[in-house]
Amino acid sequence: MASVKLASLMVLFATLGMFLTKNVGAASCNGVCSPFEMPPCGSSACRCIPVGLVVGYCRHPSGVFLRTNDEHPNLCESDADCRKKGSGNFCGHYPNPDIEYGWCFASKSEAEDFFSKITQKDLLKSVSTA
């Protein structure tokens, strides 16, 4: 009788262990993010969709960006996107290689100035917490 209970308990733990290990590798693409995080959202399986210049929300990359890019006035893939939307003349791409789009600025110098300030702040913040 004890061996039947022990066997049932072993099967229960084995089943539970299989489900837990399957979900360990799954990326959760929810929550707030920054396009400057590397990788964005804590996983390269997720994308950070900006709603502001330095803040966004995490999503799986399945076609979400194409819809968002067309709807958002400042998201761009090229300088032509910015001019077409009337949001600027220059598409400044994020310095994060996981982000394949940029933000519209009035000029290249404005984009360089903004990104240099942000990356310096992030660098100083990461050095001070280390």
UniProtKB/Swiss-Prot annotation:
Residues 1-26 form the signal peptide. InterPro entries: Albumin_I, Albumin_I_a. One of its GO terms (molecular function) is nutrient reservoir activity. Pfam families: Albumin_I (PF08027), Albumin_I_a (PF16720). Major component of both the cotyledons and embryonic axes of mature seeds. Transmembrane segments: none annotated. The C-terminal glycine may be removed from PA1b. Disulfide bonds join 29-46, 33-48, 41-58. Residues 64-69, 123-130 form a propeptide. Keywords: Disulfide bond, Knottin, Seed storage protein, Signal, Storage protein, Toxin. PA1b binds to basic 7S globulin (BG) and stimulates its phosphorylation activity. Involved in the signal transduction system to regulate the growth and differentiation as a hormone peptide. Toxic to various insects through binding to a high affinity binding site in the insect gut. The presence of a 'disulfide through disulfide knot' structurally defines this protein as a knottin. This is Albumin-1 B. It comes from Pisum sativum (Garden pea).
